């Protein structure tokens, strides 16, 4: 839609374009590849700045209104008296205006498409700027808005220029006729809601404003309007043809010539020129303004995420005198994407997608993404074995794709379409009135991004059901770009609108037979009749808070079933926003913290990294199963380890394998071997072991691959994609020498045992160890008690929408059974003096409303060394849900500086999330033992521990543990991490059993059966001593 006469503000408002799904723009220029109009070839070749691009980022003037009708007519030509400075790009909600709203599924406005509320927050921006006088003499001056949420009208010097919507793709307008010498004034009226908001119901914060770059671009009268590159490889991949289609514009294009030059590392590879005019395409002739060239390339360096080899293509438009009018340029990656034999392949090899979903989110800047944050995201992803990213759920900032090209990441580029809150979800997708809007969101994305080699898959959007509009857009995509597959999950991931079976949150082995959209287990799915497509999970492993359990199980399936080709973890970063409390201190806020209604509370906290991009423990776990190296013990005598490279295209030219053999964490022997493997190759290593019978303890072999030299995405000596493995070699026990006997003293109220400088006190009324003195100093702040519950995880809560409670969720079952309100009752508490030791036996029943849920029998033995030995048996009622844990809890008086342990570490790990942890002897500061999840939950566990030292306390056995300044009760009752208050001493939780955290999703019970207590009786032992 174009060439509409200039209208008054009141006339534009009366027309209400923002409530008409057929109207998506007025006067917006056609979509195209990014343009720069360089003046010389070296600048274009080197991707230097272009003098014909002028940024308008900076401080604009801004006035806020609660509805567009409140904007005065005079604002079009002059600022309002209350105008303030507003940074561009930014979201105005992050600058103190209006309220950010977080919802997952629920629309933030009443559902009545295409209409939006009368109260429609409106931001009025203005900027005074100047342009080069030469720009006014000839050529075309455009303005490019890379992202405005959600719709806007544009004026220049009081003249209405046009209108646009679609928050995530550029809106470009021709300003030439409106510009004048000296100062010029832009006015942009941005509406928070428009009919397009019904297509933008993504799981994210709903914010507004000019949140991406604003740029002026000057083009000559005769110009390159667009270009499209395609690389074609022969079967042997040793010869390629670069095909380039160019579209020219302007009155004189017919007399022009385009010179194409292909560069690699600054050196010219090939050059060819062509005049405009295509081959005849139909009975009416040819495209006069188009031209096509093909450039053969011998032995091309191929692009992949592992080897992001890039060429540079420059396209110089010359006038009849041979003078350069302008040059456009882009990176070129030679690669072939295809689906054949049921497999997604790149350059002939089946891919294994180590992917993650990524929202554009910044805790302080909202949806504004700067280059440094983009680079940090990519570098962190690659350092943790990720090779792919899904742009969930909209086209990203244009710089993102260039960085993915250059660093090496496979990209799923996704259209800005989601109608999750509609009932049914497919309501708009099956309505032809919404086809134009949906179509522009797909076609314009492709026209902007199709030259990027990193983009290997197009996506039609997310969670919008399945309708005829999807089928139409799928066919357009397959016709326009046959070089890439298309994926779309809506309608059950099994429709004709997708080349890939791409379900979300399908389980490895368990079916979810939902009506109309069943989710079969992924192993079953690829074996369904007539199903020949690859399966790649568009979302899986929901990393909400303390989650990500069972991730390794997916990777066991991916590695053993070729057509299970990986997936995209949900998701990259916790979508929390920085907020200040009443005292001016900053904290990370989630849904509802801004008074936003509706909201879905902490459901925005699903990241592998915190908002500041520091890692969650789950990131390390992702690092492990999807690593590029796997290790197999081939034989034990001699000890031979085989290393398998998962690189498809890279030789191991920067990898060394470090190995250590350690007894109880103490290194016995170590070595290093340079790896020299071809892609997908193997290498065997024989390790000469020392004599292992010389002492007690467990002996482990740890292996790890490191990269000695720095890479573009990692520093030197980093663990190569976290590639590590561990193998138990031997376990022996040590007998302790005999020393002085412990002495028992009894009264009606207490049992007291003394051994040298130590005294233990058991209270007969409670049956608990209530105090432990050393040198007369109390070391306990609470009794040692049974512990069967945990501060609920998000996965335990099992609520995907804050207004709904799932009675099948673990926490609801535990609450109903009374596990958070147990009353212990002592049945037995007696002690006996033996020759060298004292034995205390106790028996407790843990009751809820008079019903016995647990029976705990304990035998405490204090031996000649002053060591407390515990032998505990716990029996459970047959009709109660399986508990979160079985163990003990105590509040220690000491606040140690460090915690030391022998077991899995160093980071937090849980029974179903411990593959990336290493066996070793670890030391961490006490504060590092706590994981600061924004929504407080159970955290900080370390598994498979054999020795623990917390200050003077040393515990031995085989157990899991956590040490924290915060009690489980405080964690359970606190809504935000910054509200936690450190308690004196520290809390020690000692677990014989701890249920997995789950994570297949966060709204249904997802802990695998093997990580749920399978027996109704559990016995465990440990020893505890205090060291001077």
Swiss-Prot record:
Mg(2+) 1 binds at residues 418, 420, 463. Mg(2+) 2 binds at residue 599. Binds 2 magnesium ions per monomer. Binds 1 sodium ion per monomer. It is an enzyme of class 3 (hydrolase). GO terms for cellular component: beta-galactosidase complex. Na(+) binds at residues 203, 603, 606. SMART domains: Bgal_small_N. Its EC number is 3.2.1.23. Signal peptide: none annotated. One of its GO terms (molecular function) is magnesium ion binding. Substrate binds at residues 104, 203, 463, 539-542, 606, 1003. One of its GO terms (biological process) is lactose catabolic process. The record marks 359, 393 as: Transition state stabilizer. Transmembrane segments: none annotated. InterPro entries: B-gal_small/dom_5, Bact_Beta-galactosidase, Beta-gal/glucu_dom_sf, Gal_mutarotase_sf_dom, Galactose-bd-like_sf, GH-type_carb-bd, Glyco_hydro_2, Glyco_hydro_2_AS. The active site is at 463 (proton donor), 539 (nucleophile). It catalyses: Hydrolysis of terminal non-reducing beta-D-galactose residues in beta-D-galactosides. Its cofactor is Mg(2+); Na(+). Keywords: Glycosidase, Hydrolase, Magnesium, Metal-binding, Sodium. Belongs to the glycosyl hydrolase 2 family. Homotetramer. NCBIfam families: PRK09525.1. This is Beta-galactosidase. It comes from Enterobacter cloacae.
